[in-house]
Amino acid sequence: MEQKIKKLTSILFLLLCVPLSAENKKADLIESEAHAILIPGSGTYSKKISTQNKEAQQFFDQGLRLAWGFYFPESIASYLEAARHDPDHPMPYWGMAHAMGPNPNSRYSGMPDDPKGEGFKAIKKAMDRIENASDMEAKLIQALHILYDKDTYPDAKQRDQAYLAAMRK
């Protein structure tokens, strides 16, 4: 019970400290002030990325865990913070694009794909930095780019299928 209270208190503190909406945070703005804090008790899963910056890695991991928990605004804030620590690494921008949508699951509830275009801006930034990615990171970035590629795949179902095929590689 005490662990739950600590976790909820930490999340509440984060909600009070960072903007609650991706609409309020432009994916192309990486400012000097902090966008997020490391939340105690938010998990230990780590997906090593090719950054040499310890803080960027920690915030990337937190962003991934929060996105998997459907805490998308907090996830985006964590990815923004990772990008602040390593602005040339593409994976924080990949994370932002991943958390901002489009999301094949959300379409079933009628949510629009990337209504403000912020996710597209983020994946474009990741693509612009892809030379700084490992081979696996580059494949993840290229696969996620497909979900935003309305020129090649005008139909959302086509994009979903192409994305799934790319992720299977």
Regions found by a protein language model. Name each.
Residues M1, A22-E23:
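A cross-taxon signal for low-complexity, glycine/charged-rich
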Residues L12-F13, R129:
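Compositionally biased non-globular segments, especially hydrophobic aliphatic-rich helices
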Residues E2-T9:
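Bacterial N-terminal signal peptides that target proteins for export
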Residues N24-K169:
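Short coil/linker segments at helix-helix boundaries
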